[in-house]
C-alpha cells in the first residue's frame, strides 16, 4: 500500500496517469523512462502507428508488441491527443478481421483498407537460363545488376524446380499506408493544432513529411528498434528528429509472458 501511495504522489507531479495496476508498478520501477517520454510528449501529441511496419519487429526484438497494452500505456500520458492505427484487412480471413475488430475495441483511431493479393509469375519456361526478367520482380535493381550470370542461372534453376512441381505463381500481399500517414500528419499540423508528432515506423517513405514538419519547427519522434530506421530518416536527426528505441519500454507494451525480470 505504501508503494502504491508513493507512486500516486509522484504521478500527480507528472503527466503520466497509469491506466492499470501493472503500469503503476512499472512506473515506480522505471521512472527515468517515463520522464524521457514526458519530454517527448510535452505538448499536444498525435501518434501514428504503421502496424505493417511495426509487426515484423518482433523477429528482431525477440518479443511482441501487444496493441491493447500499447494503447493503455500511451493513454496514460495526458498530452496524447489521439493514437492512429494503420493496418490492412485481408477480406475473408477470420484472423485478420478479428484482429482489426479488436484494435477498434481498444479505442485506437483505426484506419484500414483491403489488402491486395498480387499474383507474381515465377514461370521461367519461356526465358533463357541467364535472363533476369522474372527475378527483377523480386530483387531490387541495384542488387540484381551486381549478380553474376552464374547466380542468376542458379536462381532461375530454383524457380524451374518449383515449375516442375506445378507452381507457376506466388501470392504477395500489399497494403501500404505511407501516403495516408504522411498526409494525415501534415493535415494535423495545418488544421488540428498538433505540436508533437510520434511515428511508429522506420520507413524511408516518411522522410519528406517528417522533414517538412521539422522545417516548420515541430517536434517529431520516430519510435522504432535498432537497425529498423531507414538511412533517410536517420539523416534527419541533424534536423532535430528524435529516435526512441522501443526496447526501453518493452515491459510496458509486450505480451505479459515476455516481460523481462530484473
What does each model-found stretch correspond to?
Residues 5-6:
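Leucine-biased recognition of intrinsically disordered, low-complexity hydrophobic segments
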Residues 9-154, 170, 214-228:
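Domain-level signal for Mg2+-assisted phosphodiester chemistry and nucleotide/NA-binding surfaces
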Residues 112, 117-262:
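Nuclease catalytic cores that cleave nucleic-acid phosphodiester bonds
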Amino acid at each position: 500500500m505504501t508503494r502504491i501511495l508513493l507512486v500516486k504522489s509522484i504521478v500527480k507531479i507528472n503527466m503520466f496517469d497509469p491506466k492499470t495496476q501493472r503500469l503503476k508498478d512499472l512506473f515506480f520501477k522505471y521512472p527515468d523512462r517515463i520522464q524521457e517520454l514526458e519530454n517527448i510528449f510535452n505538448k499536444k501529441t498525435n501518434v501514428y502507428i504503421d502496424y505493417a511496419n511495426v509487426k515484423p519487429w518482433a523477429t528482431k526484438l525477440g518479443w511482441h508488441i501487444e496493441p491493447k497494452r500499447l494503447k493503455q500505456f500511451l493513454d496514460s500520458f495526458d498530452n496524447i491527443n489521439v493514437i492512429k492505427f494503420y493496418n490492412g484487412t485481408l477480406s475473408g480471413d477470420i484472423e485478420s478481421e478479428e484482429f482489426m475488430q479488436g484494435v477498434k475495441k481498444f479505442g485506437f483511431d483505426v484506419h484500414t483498407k483491403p489488402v491486395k493479393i498480387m499474383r507474381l509469375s515465377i514461370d521461367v519456361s519461356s526465358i533463357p537460363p541467364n535472363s533476369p526478367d522474372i527475378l527483377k520482380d523480386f530483387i531490387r535493381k541495384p542488387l540484381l545488376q551486381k549478380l553474376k550470370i552464374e547466380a542468376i542461372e542458379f536462381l532461375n534453376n530454383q524457380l524451374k524446380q518449383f515449375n516442375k512441381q506445378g507452381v507457376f505463381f506466388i501470392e504477395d500481399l500489399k497494403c501500404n499506408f505511407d501516403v495516408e500517414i504522411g498526409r494525415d500528419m501534415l493535415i494535423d499540423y495545418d488544421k488540428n493544432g498538433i505540436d508533437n508528432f510520434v511515428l511508429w515506423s522506420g520507413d524511408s517513405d516518411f522522410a519528406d513529411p517528417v522533414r517538412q514538419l521539422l522545417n516548420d519547427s515541430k517536434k517529431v519522434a520516430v519510435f522504432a528498434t535498432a537497425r529498423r530506421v531507414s538511412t533517410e530518416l536517420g539523416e534527419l536527426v541533424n534536423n532535430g528528429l528524435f529516435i526512441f528505441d522501443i526496447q526501453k519500454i518493452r515491459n510496458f507494451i509486450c505480451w505479459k509472458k515476455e516481460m523481462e525480470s530484473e
